[in-house]
Regions:
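Structural signature of outer-membrane beta-barrel domains
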Residues: 1-7, 14, 43-45, 56-60, ...
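Repeated loop/turn-to-beta-strand initiation elements of outer-membrane beta-barrel proteins
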Residues: 44-49, 103-106, 149-153, 189-194
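Hydrophobic, lipid-facing positions within transmembrane beta-strands of outer-membrane proteins
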Residues: 22, 32-36, 90-94, 137-141, ...
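Membrane-embedded beta-barrel scaffold of Gram-negative outer-membrane proteins
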Residues: 5, 25-90, 97-99, 116-118
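C-terminal beta-barrel architecture of Gram-negative outer-membrane proteins
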Residues: 17-19, 117, 132-186, 197-201, ...
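C-terminal beta-signal and adjacent terminal beta-strands/loops
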Residues: 57-59, 64, 106, 159-164, ...
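Outer-membrane beta-barrel translocator domains and adjoining extracellular loop/strand segments
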Residues: 8-17, 61-69, 75, 113, ...
């Protein structure tokens, strides 16, 4: 398969910055993807699984970078998109569902990913490094139990390994694991879910910014954006 991400303009940036003037326009990114996979049902269809191997080539890869135009003024911190020549992604995806009983099924999804930045002339120091926000390992495991009177209970555990926050610096996140639970009711016309996400209120970070913001020396410091804390809510759906 082949696809592309359209190009664009870096607007609202400081036109006095030489790098910005050279990067006002960025080109489309092109992706060529190769996949090979199998799916099957085993043991009278109690076990369903799929296995996919993929390889992707990215040409004129778009990367979001950040920089502080004036080292003494944190208000000049800006973002811009550049084309980083080439990128490479490959990995494995495994999904499975197992019906342990008529009222209980278990699921497990695993992902293994390797990425690489290639031929970025303005950042040769990143040659061969993994791309940002591309954890090598990810997984989701859990189960769904159907109770009496159209009630059900679902438990899910999601996890990711560490990943680079940005293509502008080399700081990485920590691996994390989140647990979600849903208690619900469903019939042909109506459904209601009481859900708790991140039930153990784990701290984890989703983005990281590295720049100088504190006087007098404005030493580069890592600032993290926290992921969602524990959330409790209700979802209602009605079929007309």
């Amino acid at each position: 398969a082949r696809g592309y991400k359209q190009g664009g303009f870096n607007l609202g940036l400081d036109a006095t910055d030489n790098l910005v003037r050279q990067s006002l326009i960025y080109d489309p990114e092109y992706l060529t993807n190769y996949e090979f996979g199998i799916s099957s049902n085993l043991k009278d269809r109690d076990l369903n699984y799929s296995f996919v191997i993929f390889f992707s080539e990215r040409k004129d890869q778009q990367v979001l970078i950040s920089r502080q135009v004036d080292p003494t003024d944190p208000n000049t911190f800006s973002y811009l998109t550049q084309n980083a020549a080439e990128g490479e992604n490959y990995g494995i995806e495994i999904t499975s569902n197992y019906f342990l009983r008529d009222d209980l099924y278990l699921f497990a999804n695993l992902g293994f990913l390797k990425t690489k930045i290639k031929n970025w002339e303005s950042r040769i120091d990143l040659e061969g490094r993994s791309q940002a926000h591309a954890p090598e390992h990810s997984y989701s495991i859990g189960g769904n139990l159907n109770l009496k009177n159209n009630l059900y209970l679902k438990l899910e555990i999601n996890g990711k390994s560490s990943f680079y926050y940005s293509d502008s610096h080399d700081n990485q996140s920590k691996s994390y694991q989140l647990t979600n639970i849903i208690f619900g009711y469903s019939n042909s016309d109506f459904s209601a879910d009481l859900w708790i996400r991140n039930i153990f209120n784990k701290y984890y970070s989703t983005r990281g910014f590295y720049f100088g913001n504190e006087a007098p020396n404005f030493i580069d410091t890592l600032y993290r954006r926290q992921g969602d804390p524990r959330n409790i809510g209700i979802s209602l759906r009605y079929n007309f």
